[in-house]
C-alpha cells in the first residue's frame, strides 16, 4: 500500500509500520485437559496435522488449499480453524470440493483461547497460508512465531514477510499437493522454525512496532 501511495502521490509523506506479534510459547502441555479435549474431539494428535487459521473468505484460497490437500498422499489431517458456521461459502466449498468425503479434512470452528491456539500452532506439522490480499497478515506472523514449517502462497507481500523461512506454493494445479508430499517425507524443520522466529524477533515484535509508533508521533512537526 505504501508503495502504491508513493507512486501515485509522490509528494505524500508516508511511513510504513508493520503489524506485530509475540513469541511467547504456550504454557500448556500435552496432558492439559483442554488440549486433550480438543485433540480427542478432532481425532488428531500432535504433529499429525496441517493447519489453517483465518477468516473464512474466498480470497484466503480455502478452495485451492483443500483441493490440493485432498490430492496429496499425506496421512496427516487438515485442521481448519475458522468461522465457517452458517456460511454460504462453506456450502459452496462442499459442493466444489466434496471435502466431506475425505476424513482428513476437518473444520473445527473457532479457537479464542490464545494459549490453546499457540499450542495448536506449535504442534502442527505445518501451517498452510493462502492469504492473497492485504499487507502484513497477523495470521502469518503468528505462524512464523509458533510453527516450524510454513507453506505460504507465493505473492509479494507474503514473501516480503516470511523470506527464506517458508516454502512457497502457487495456485497451479498440483503445486501445493506436491509440496505437501515432499514436506511429508522430511522430519526435521527446526532450522526453518528458527529462521521464522528470527524474522519475527527482528522485525515484528510488539515492542518494535510500539517503538516505531512512538517515534512517529513524538517526531511529528
Model-based region annotation:
Residues 50, 65-66, 78, 143, ...:
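A structural motif in glycosyltransferase catalytic domains
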Residues 1-38, 44-45, 106:
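Donor nucleotide-sugar binding/catalytic pocket of nucleotide-sugar-dependent glycosyltransferases
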Residues 21, 53, 77-91, 106-111:
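Glycosyltransferase donor-sugar binding loop
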Residues 119-135, 148:
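Acidic donor-binding loop of glycosyltransferase active sites
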Residues 187-218:
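A charged, aromatic-enriched C-terminal amphipathic alpha-helix characteristic of glycosyltransferases
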Residues 145-152:
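Short hydrophobic beta-strand element within catalytic cores of glycosyltransferases
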Residues 41-60, 66-73, 79:
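Conserved donor-binding/catalytic core segment of Leloir-type glycosyltransferases
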Residues 166-174, 181-187:
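Conserved acidic donor-binding segment of nucleotide-sugar-dependent glycosyltransferases
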Amino acid at each position: 500500500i505504501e508503495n502504491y501511495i508513493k507512486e501515485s502521490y509522490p509528494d505524500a509523506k508516508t511511513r510504513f509500520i508493520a503489524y506485530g506479534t509475540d513469541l511467547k510459547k504456550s504454557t500448556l502441555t500435552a496432558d492439559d485437559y483442554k488440549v486433550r479435549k480438543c485433540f480427542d474431539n478432532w481425532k488428531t494428535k500432535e504433529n499429525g496435522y496441517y493447519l489453517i487459521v483465518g477468516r473464512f473468505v474466498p480470497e484466503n484460497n480455502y478452495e485451492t488449499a483443500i483441493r490440493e490437500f485432498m490430492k496429496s498422499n499425506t496421512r496427516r489431517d487438515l485442521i481448519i480453524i475458522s468461522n465457517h458456521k452458517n456460511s454460504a461459502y462453506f456450502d459452496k466449498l462442499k459442493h466444489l470440493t466434496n471435502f466431506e468425503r475425505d476424513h482428513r479434512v476437518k473444520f473445527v470452528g473457532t479457537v479464542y483461547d490464545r494459549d490453546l491456539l499457540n499450542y495448536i500452532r506449535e504442534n502442527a506439522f505445518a501451517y498452510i497460508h493462502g492469504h492473497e490480499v492485504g499487507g502484513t497478515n497477523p495470521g502469518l506472523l503468528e505462524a512464523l512465531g509458533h510453527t516450524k514449517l510454513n507453506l505460504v502462497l507465493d505473492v509479494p507481500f507474503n514473501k516480503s514477510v516470511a523470506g527464506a523461512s517458508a516454502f512457497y506454493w502457487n495456485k497451479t494445479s498440483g503445486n501445493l499437493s506436491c509440496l505437501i508430499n515432499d514436506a511429508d517425507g522430511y522430519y526435521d524443520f527446526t532450522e526453518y522454525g528458527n529462521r521464522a522466529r528470527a524474522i519475527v524477533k527482528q522485525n515484528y515484535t510488539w515492542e518494535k512496532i510500539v517503538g516505531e509508533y512512538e517515534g512517529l508521533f513524538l517526531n511529528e512537526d
